[in-house]
């Protein structure tokens, strides 16, 4: 029995705390599941939401509404999980005690919650470093700094994705 691997079921029928359908993060003072944000972000060339497991041409960043190449979407997905575990460090510590991570709904998607959770459990700092090197993150850092500079100048600027302040619709409730 000592050699049995500990397996964490990362899906909605397993430990829901490790399911993108249940794990929640706050963006612009609103709470969304990681899955809702991720699926909302993926777009076809005409700007419509691509749909789960469907091909997509680019993604819309939920933080600022900017468009990014589809190749960068994994950094957004990892970033959302990093946000979640920053709010729930005890869960990442718990997950790091497992040997294997399973998502029974994995499919052919380029991003899998079990894979990301396993990566973060093994070496969170490495994943954070990789995300910070992405064009998506660097753009977000510049955008955030710009907002901060405007606030220091006394300019009140609030971006609210739910008011549709970009050409794209808001994340639906």
Describe the role of every protein-language-model region:
Residues 16-20, 29, 101, 166, ...:
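Intrinsic structural disorder
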Residues 10, 22, 61-64, 112:
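Generic recognition of cysteine residues
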Residues 45-102, 120-122, 126-159:
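Long, contiguous internal "core" modules enriched in hydrophobic/ aromatic residues
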Residues 106-120:
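Active-site nucleophilic cysteine motif
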Residues 9-13, 67-71, 102-110:
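Short, charged/polar micro-motifs that form catalytic or ligand-binding hotspots
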Residues 1-40:
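N-terminal accessory segments that precede or flank the first globular/catalytic domain
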Residues 151, 156-173:
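Intrinsically disordered, low-structural-confidence terminal and linker regions
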């Amino acid at each position: 029995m000592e050699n049995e691997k500990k397996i964490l079921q990362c899906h909605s029928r397993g430990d829901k705390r490790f399911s993108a359908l249940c794990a929640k993060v706050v963006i612009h003072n609103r709470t969304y599941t990681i899955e809702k944000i991720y699926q909302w972000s993926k777009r076809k060339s005409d700007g419509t939401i691509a749909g789960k497991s469907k091909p997509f041409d680019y993604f819309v960043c939920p933080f600022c509404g900017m468009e990014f190449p589809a190749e960068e979407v994994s950094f957004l997905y990892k970033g959302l999980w990093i946000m979640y575990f920053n709010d729930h460090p005890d869960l990442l510590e718990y997950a790091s005690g497992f040997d294997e991570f399973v998502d029974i709904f994995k499919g052919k998607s380029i991003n899998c919650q079990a894979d990301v959770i396993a990566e973060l459990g093994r070496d969170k700092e490495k994943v954070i470093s990789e995300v910070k090197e992405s064009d998506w993150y660097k753009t977000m850092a510049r955008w955030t700094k710009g907002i901060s500079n405007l606030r220091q100048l006394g300019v009140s600027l609030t971006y609210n994705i739910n008011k549709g302040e970009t050409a794209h619709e808001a994340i639906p409730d």
